[in-house]
Amino acid sequence: NRVLFSAEQLQSTLDKAGYQVMMQQGDTTFSDPEIKTILLTEVNDTTLKKEGFHITTTGNLTRVSGRDGSGVIYGSRELIDRVNDSDGKLDFPEELKDGPEMVLRGACVGLQKMTYLPGHGVYEYPYTPESFPWFYDKEQWIKYLDMLVANRMNSLYLWNGHPFASLVKLEDYPFALEVDEETFKKNEEMFSFLTEEADKRGIFVIQMFYNIILSKPFAEHYGLKTQDRNRPITPLIADYTRKSIAAFIEKYPNVGLLVCLGEAMCTVEDDVEWFTKTIIPGVKDGLQALGRTDEPPLLLRAHDTDCKLVMDAALPIYKNLYTMHKYNGESLTTYEPRGPLSL
């Protein structure tokens, strides 16, 4: 519950500032004008932006009204910042309306390494404690997520080549799992923890992946390469990927996807087909299994593809779409203009 999270954050700040705090849920009556009271509520106020808030103070009553749960979080953060910046004074605004200007605001964390793993190609890094011990540190993640909230960020991007074979099991392809059973259970527990804690804070965990990459056990089972830029789309590969995405969306709350159609695909026509007939249907399958009608964010990386062509084909079937550029070092260290493949 984002309102409860906001209240707990406010309480912690006021405790540290030396105030005696009593938190009460459900009762919105203001009974004692001598006691400083902060009331946190979600309101259906369409004059506020999405994730926006409205703060009013009359006497000892300060109301923080959020357009949604995230709005309550950001309104509460406004009060927290004012307490911290004024040596603990409770100098709250008589009236303030605010909300984010940018729809997605976030930070990227790479689950990749500077060297290849033995037996694997580029971008192929299963989620394991040996490769990424820090990923399993819950205390560190709580601090990081709280930092994102303090900076009004609403998305966390995890960058990896093919994460699904570390995070979900497929009934039709049980052999595709890329980690041992003990590690898989750790990954399930850790990713569930991360996405649930992020959800409390109004943060989408957006998983990035390259295309088309197959899990190593899956590829070996069918005598395929994990990556082959010149390989056409086949029904088998499409089915495996679609079911992987569906299982991921169904299993973990508050996730989105960042899709790179570059590196291991051949033509723009394949990009369009893959995005509209495999990836988006996979997302929709996962949502349908949950009975959800919302659309989580789906980002298309503009690298090595015709972004406009793909987006134009995708928008009729999926609306919550975004694009992004990753500005690579090799593009920034030359004064010569670079083409689309450098982004």
Task: Explain the meaning of each model-derived region.
Residues 1, 39-44, 65-67, 111, ...:
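Structural motif
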Residues 2-4, 72, 165-167, 215-217, ...:
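Extracytoplasmic/secreted cell-surface and envelope-processing proteins
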Residues 6-26:
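N-terminal segment of the mature soluble domain
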Residues 6-9, 13, 46-52, 56-234, ...:
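Feature activates predominantly on carbohydrate-active enzymes
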Residues 19-27, 88-95, 159, 261, ...:
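Surface-exposed patches in mature extracellular/periplasmic domains of secreted proteins
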Residues 22-50:
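Short, well-ordered secondary-structure micro-motifs within conserved domains or adaptor modules
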Residues 23-25, 207, 300:
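A structural preference for short, hydrophobic beta-strand core positions in alpha/beta folds
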Residues 154, 178, 185-188, 192-193, ...:
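Catalytic-core regions of glycoside hydrolase
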